[in-house]
Amino acid sequence: MNTLYTLFATCPRGLETVLSQELESLGCTDVQVFDGGVSCRGGLEQVYAANLHSRTASRILLRLTKGTYRNERDIYKLAKNINWFNWFTLQQTFKVKVEAKRANVKSIQFVGLTVKDAVCDAFRDIYDARPSVDKAAPDVRIHAFLNERNVEIFIDTSGEALFKRGYRLDTGEAPLRENLAAGLLLSAGYDGTQPFQDPFCGSGTIAIEAAWIAARRAPGMMRRFGFEKLQNFDKTLWSDLRRRAEAQTRPVRAPIAGSDNDRRIVQTALDNARRAGVDDIVSFSVADAQSVRPNGENGIMVSNPPYGVRLEEVRALQALYPQLGTWLKKHYAGWLAAMFTGDREMPKFMCLSPKRKIPLYNGNIDCRLFLIDMVEGSNR
């Protein structure tokens, strides 16, 4: 019998709609968008497929229970009533993380200890022993979410966060997480059939994610997952899903290029591309952005140009933006330029009018993805 679970997939804020489309395409049902994630229903196949195939999710959480509470004692009872031994063994380690929004509790840390005690006591009642906690590298991660009246307890099927694809060991000074980079590409309409460029490529994350989209490469192929350590792990199903994922890859026809004016960071991008298995697909070079020229017609540029945090940085960059606008208008007619930035004034200083402004967060930084159709001459 195929048990259906209630799932919650977390993602960078602003990518919830893109993630919901991914989950629907993987066969999830009852898909609902919330701030910071998407809830849905699915069986083990959808759990495994979401971890393997979602480009934008951060974690796939599986709900074990939901209830109301008045105090920490209610949370303890709810957590202790879960059949934890159906999910992991006494010999495995675990960790509890609690998140709350307007919760009626004295301390989030105390709720974490309460859930931890409930798990340990549930095991102790059966085995007269308790599993150990490992905060650094647990076998099993448990998440509790509280609001004013309700508590939900989940088991994390992902393990390490899904943006950890396995190819990026070295990071640039301001690395863009892989799932956010993929989300920028999908939000811009990139599907791998158009020429692609990133003239501010940094450590290459956007270009590498573009190559994986173009090759139909599942982003989870290089890593392990939390669900592989759970008691209900179906090895046959997982092997079949991986085999199908390998069979769906395709040759990349359209060119993909990244460039940066920092030789050291371009070397990092080359190393990352090699580990990602796309060094024969992505062309990286050392170049000042304004010396770069299109690698085809009607392409897509997705880039995270430098933007300032301190006032003097902002002023220096805002002097550069008009030059970038002139360069784009002169050389990139027919292209879509998707600029991701924390500087909402960027298009104005570039003298360009975006057709769409998509609010997104890079960590805690409130950013915008500006989609600009490039036409010859002035675009204002």
Swiss-Prot record:
GO CC terms: cytoplasm
Keyword Ligase appears in the UniProt entry: no
SUPFAM superfamilies: S-adenosyl-L-methionine-dependent methyltransferases
Top-level lineage group: Bacteria
GO molecular function: 23S rRNA (guanine(2445)-N(2))-methyltransferase activity; RNA binding; tRNA (guanine) methyltransferase activity
InterPro entries per the UniProt record, alphabetical: DNA_methylase_N6_adenine_CS, RlmKL-like_Mtase, RlmKL-like_Mtase_CS, RlmL_1st, SAM-dependent_MTases_sf, THUMP_dom
GO biological process, one term: tRNA methylation
Function (record text): Specifically methylates the guanine in position 2445 (m2G2445) of 23S rRNA.
Protein's name according to its UniProt entry: Ribosomal RNA large subunit methyltransferase L
Taxonomic source organism: Neisseria meningitidis serogroup B (strain ATCC BAA-335 / MC58)
GN (gene name): rlmL
